[in-house]
Amino acid sequence: SPKAIAAIKAGLDDLHRYPEVVLGDFLRALAAHTGLELSQLVVGPGSDELLTRLVHAYAGPGDELVHSAHCYGKFPIYARMAGAAPVAAPDRDFRVDVDAVLSCLTERTRIVLLANPDNPTGAWISGAELRRLHAGLPDHTVLAIDGAYTDYVSDPHYEDGLALAAGANNVVV
């Protein structure tokens, strides 16, 4: 298309330069889309890298990461990579059991990492249950929600956790 050709020609003068490091336009669009502040956003080369960095930032040797029993298979690996112990909270009918997650928390729990919706089961946690889980966390524990499959859920009781993250300093989505 003529517009595509014009855009390519317009960018030729800067091809030898590094791309914008701070991703300003992208981050502003992401903030507008999510309702979060720019200071609450972190982007990276993919969820695997971001989750690895998140776990390393908050957990280490002697710490614990709580996840659901039927979770994405790399969640316990992320914990071990950081030197932390993975703790599997029992599920109920292949769904996250918030009471079981809360009962697994100890002084050493630094992260509760859950996929919502879950991978591989597809089960999801309602907004009310997410808020109840968050309310039961000690101050030293981060609730990390992997929302890779959020767009597949259309039930009105589902919440992706962004509103929770907007108002809390220990929630990561």
Regions found by a protein language model. Give the residues of each.
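N-terminal small-domain helix-loop-helix segment of the aminotransferase-like
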Residues: 1-48, 53
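Hydrophobic alpha-helical segments typical of transmembrane helices
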Residues: 4, 26, 50, 74, ...
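PLP-dependent aminotransferase-like
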Residues: 16, 24, 40, 57-114
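Short gly/ser/thr-rich secondary-structure transition/capping motifs
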Residues: 45, 91-96, 154-155
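Short glycine-rich anion-binding loops that position phosphate/pyrophosphate groups of nucleotides
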Residues: 47-48, 72, 116-120, 149-150
